[in-house]
Amino acid sequence: MAFLKDLYKNKVAKDLQKEFAYSSVMQIPKIEKVVINAGIGNAVADKKHLEAAISELTLITGQRPVETKAKKSIATFKLRAGQSIGAKVTLRGDRMWAFIETLFNIALPRVRDFKGISNNSFDDQGNYTLGIKEQIIFPQVVYDDVKSVRGFDVTFVTTAKTAQEAKALLVGLGAPFQKVRGDK
């Protein structure tokens, strides 16, 4: 599963250095980590929803997630401070590259009516956040074992200084962005 890592080292990094005229190899943007976050609203009423989400995220990422807890009590939602309401995983190294490869090449093309990922989800620091609506697009999740369909957020944390650099990095790695009028 090191195909994307090799692609980055051998091709994408060199292309980025030429495109943005970096003077040092250390200036070339790279992906530092991928953070997957799932907020489980049903976990307040029933702990089984949280356990199911954790097991599905474990299957998808190959790493056990950490439970996220509520910071404040909110009476309207019957939520107490410190109560588990979600899960998150931070992927680095080989697991990160394997997840990115699975996401771009297998999972996203399985989305119904998929036209590409949004061009507008970059922040000012060159990070990209993507929302996944259904966990069943991943081949690791068995459709018959899923009790409820839930989504999660995927954040690509990069060393890029601008959104333009981050987009060039992700496009080089094969991210299927939406076509904008005028693009080839």
Swiss-Prot record:
Coiled-coil intervals: none
A GO CC term attached to the entry: ribosome
Keyword tRNA-binding: yes
A Pfam family that the UniProt record links to this protein: Ribosomal_L5
Gene Ontology biological-process annotations: translation
Annotated keywords: Ribonucleoprotein, Ribosomal protein, RNA-binding, rRNA-binding, tRNA-binding
Gene Ontology terms for molecular function: rRNA binding; structural constituent of ribosome; tRNA binding
Family matches, as HAMAP family: Ribosomal_uL5_B
Function: This is one of the proteins that bind and probably mediate the attachment of the 5S RNA into the large ribosomal subunit, where it forms part of the central protuberance. In the 70S ribosome it contacts protein S13 of the 30S subunit (bridge B1b), connecting the 2 subunits; this bridge is implicated in subunit movement. Contacts the P site tRNA; the 5S rRNA and some of its associated proteins might help stabilize positioning of ribosome-bound tRNAs.
Subunit structure: Part of the 50S ribosomal subunit; part of the 5S rRNA/L5/L18/L25 subcomplex. Contacts the 5S rRNA and the P site tRNA. Forms a bridge to the 30S subunit in the 70S ribosome.
Family: Belongs to the universal ribosomal protein uL5 family.
Official protein name in the record: Large ribosomal subunit protein uL5
UniProt lineage: Bacteria, Bacillati, Mycoplasmatota, Mycoplasmoidales, Mycoplasmoidaceae
